[in-house]
């Protein structure tokens, strides 16, 4: 029993360390993004941020599920994508990118209010998520809330000057 408890505690501790390393790296990249001198530089930094966002910090199976959902979404299999993203959210409700992907698929399904609810979850977890901020602009435009859409795009631009 002691061995099982030790393994469980070790797993929780190491997962926490990986998440902290991930956050530190993302924080560093956002500093670099704000000071990028041109679009090409910003794009390289943005790609690194997306790589970190779409890779679960400690659970490879969730990264794979997210990728499977993304593939389904790209193939216009929106119900299958929605199910994959929901499964990821159920397994880790604190992973912003799972909420962001589901918000995207909900937008593509025309379920704008539900998409906005998921975007709210993303931004609660990661307020600098420029993908969610621009997605929010699209959702608010679809809902004819034009000032909210403009505000979302302005916020995205503050976070990502070359967006």
Q: What residue ranges belong to the model's regions?
A:
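Helix-start (N-cap) detector for alpha-helical repeat units in TPR-like alpha-solenoids
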Residues: 62, 96-97, 130-131
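Register position in tetratricopeptide repeats
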Residues: 55, 74, 108, 142-143
């Amino acid at each position: 029993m002691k061995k099982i408890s030790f393994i469980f505690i070790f797993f929780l501790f190491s997962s926490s360390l990986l998440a902290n390393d991930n956050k530190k790296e993302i924080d560093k990249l956002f500093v670099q993004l704000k000071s990028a001198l041109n679009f090409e530089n910003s794009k390289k930094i943005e790609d690194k941020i997306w790589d970190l966002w779409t890779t679960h910090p400690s659970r490879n199976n969730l990264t794979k599920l997210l990728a499977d959902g993304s593939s389904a979404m790209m193939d216009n299999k929106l119900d299958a994508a929605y199910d994959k993203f929901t499964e990821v959210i159920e397994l880790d409700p604190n992973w912003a990118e799972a909420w962001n992907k589901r918000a995207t698929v909900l937008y593509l399904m025309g379920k704008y209010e539900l998409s906005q609810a998921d975007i709210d979850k993303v931004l609660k977890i990661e307020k600098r998520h420029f993908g969610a901020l621009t997605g929010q602009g699209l959702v608010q435009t679809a809902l004819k809330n034009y000032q909210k859409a403009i505000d979302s795009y302005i916020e995205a631009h503050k976070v990502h000057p070359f967006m």
